Every structure is written in C-alpha cells, then in structure tokens.
Regions:
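Long, low-complexity, charge-biased intrinsically disordered regions
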Residues: 1-299
Length: 299
C-alpha cells in the first residue's frame, strides 16, 4: 500500500484474479550474520497464461566481465565506486490490467469481496523483470545517460570534466564517478525516482568483495567460497598448494551411478568462482566438468 502497488476494486466480468502469498526470508550481511528479516508479498505468476496475462518477459542483467572491467577502470583512473540497492525493485514497473486476490491477513472493512487491481508490478509476475528494466531505462535516458552498446545494463554519462557510470544487476547497483560530487549527484537523481538504500563505498557485489589498498583494488570471494564448502560438506578438508593432482587419472564411470545433480551443483559453484576471481582453477574445473554424465567417487 505504501508503494501504491494496488488498489481495491470490484472484479470486472470475465476476469479471474491471481492468487498471492507471503514469502518470509532472512537478509544476510557479507560476514554471514543476519541483517534483517523480510516479509514479501508475491503473486502466483505460475498461473498466468502466455499471450493472455503477459507477452514479453525477458530482462537483461550485467555480465560479470563488465563488472570486472568497470572495477579495473576505477583502479586505473582512481575513480570513486559506491553501491546502492533498490528497495522493492519490481514494484517500480508499470503494468497493464491485472487483478489479484486480497493478501492473507489484509482486512478492509466491508470490502472483503473486492480484489486488488495491480497498478505496479509485483514479485513473481512473469513480466515483472521486463517492466522494471524498461522503467529504469526510461529514467536513465531522461537524465542524459547513454546505454552501453555491449552491455545493456551499463549506463554512462560524461562531460569534458566529469564521468559517471551506473551498472545494474537486477536491484544491485554500482555507481562509479570521477569524483565524489558526481557520485552524490547520481545518487540524488536515483533517489528522486526510486526507494533506494545507500550502501556507501562498494564492499560486496554478487559475492565479490572489493577491498581498496594503496596500490589499487583487490577482489576476493572468501566468504562465498567458505559458504559453498560448508554447503557441500568440504569445509574441514585440508588446503593444497595446486588446484589439481597431476598424478590423478580420471576416467568415465562404467559402474553404479552417483548423484549427478549434486556434482553439477558443485561444478556450477566452482565455475562462478573461476569466472569472477579465481582463473587459476579453470583447468581443474574444466577437466572435472567433462565427467558430469559419467562420474565416480574419484571425481
């Protein structure tokens, strides 16, 4: 209600409202401690019918390579890099005519039979990501930012003396500026349009920790790596100096099958690490990924 996401109306003839539910979750800090508890109302978008309730759903996100290039630019030119988070991201997108049942626990006196007409997008709607990205594009273009041709989630604005870059990954945002005044102006502009959380100097983005030193910037994923080690019960294993044993010969499994899904999850987690900060494990991960369909205990 605070975001004017919906209003109560009588259900028009011939329309069927979508259901909704509350999702309860914990937001975690980079060090693994609890930041806050969150309750989010979501629509049961899985009941939507294509070409009737929605049409396009695609929404891009920035590439990890783009984030690394931008961080390299910051280090090279000694720019400022800050971070912001968009609160209730998908609630900013504007919608066509969609109706939803009243949320559980919401009671409007003498209006129990009415339904919610969605004014803005809601989480779990099929078109929610696309609507949000279109809205963000309009805001950035109207404020003289240009969309990068190689990455549609990178926005640039430059004059003869100042330079600003905004990099968007759904609701996480890196703001880069040639000086603090540019950063402040960009933050103020975004706050005028969206409900933003200012996170100050960039610290952690997508599990990548950014540490500033006297000689530049250091990227690491210590917390993320510890998290996946605990997830796959490998946290107590002893570290080794090289990522692969040269004397180990791997072969396809011709015996009993082993949990392929768990193995694929491990490979996927390791691939994210090597793409972000640890290219030194590329050979080992590439070699292990060849046996996804024919694995044994040695793998």
């Amino acid at each position: 209600m605070h975001n004017h996401t919906w209003k109560l109306v009588d259900l028009p003839l011939g329309n069927k409202p979508l259901g909704c539910k509350w999702i309860l979750k914990k937001n975690m800090k980079p060090d693994g401690t609890i930041d806050k508890y969150k309750a989010r109302l979501v629509a049961k978008g899985f009941k939507q019918k294509e070409d009737l309730d929605f049409f396009d759903t695609y929404s891009p996100v920035t590439r990890i390579t783009s984030i690394r290039v931008l961080i390299a630019i910051v280090a090279l030119h000694n720019f400022e890099i800050h971070q912001m988070d968009v609160k209730t991201t998908f609630l900013n997108g504007e919608l066509e005519e969609i109706y939803m049942e009243q949320p559980k626990g919401f009671g409007a006196p003498r209006q129990e039979k009415k339904v919610c007409k969605l004014i803005k997008s809601l989480y779990w709607l099929k078109q929610a990501p696309k609507q949000w990205h279109e809205k963000f594009d309009k805001v950035m273009l109207s404020n003289d930012f240009k969309i990068n041709e190689c990455d549609k989630c990178v926005y640039t604005k430059n004059t003869q003396t100042e330079y600003a870059i905004v990099c968007l990954y759904v609701d996480d945002m890196l703001i880069i500026g040639s000086n603090n005044d540019v950063i402040k102006a960009t933050k103020k502009m975004l706050t005028n349009y969206f409900d933003m959380k200012d996170m100050g100097v960039a610290d952690v983005i997508l599990g990548i920790k950014i540490a500033k030193t006297s000689s530049g910037l250091i990227l690491s994923q210590c917390h993320y790596i510890e998290k996946i080690l605990k997830r796959f019960n490998q946290y107590d294993d002893s570290p080794i100096k090289t990522p692969v044993d040269l004397n180990l010969h791997l072969a396809k499994n011709n015996g009993p099958t082993i949990d392929q899904l768990e193995y694929s999850r491990i490979i996927g987690s390791l691939m994210y690490v090597l793409n972000c900060t640890r290219p030194n494990i590329a050979y080992a991960v590439n070699k292990l990924s060849r046996f996804t369909n024919n694995l044994e205990k040695d793998h």
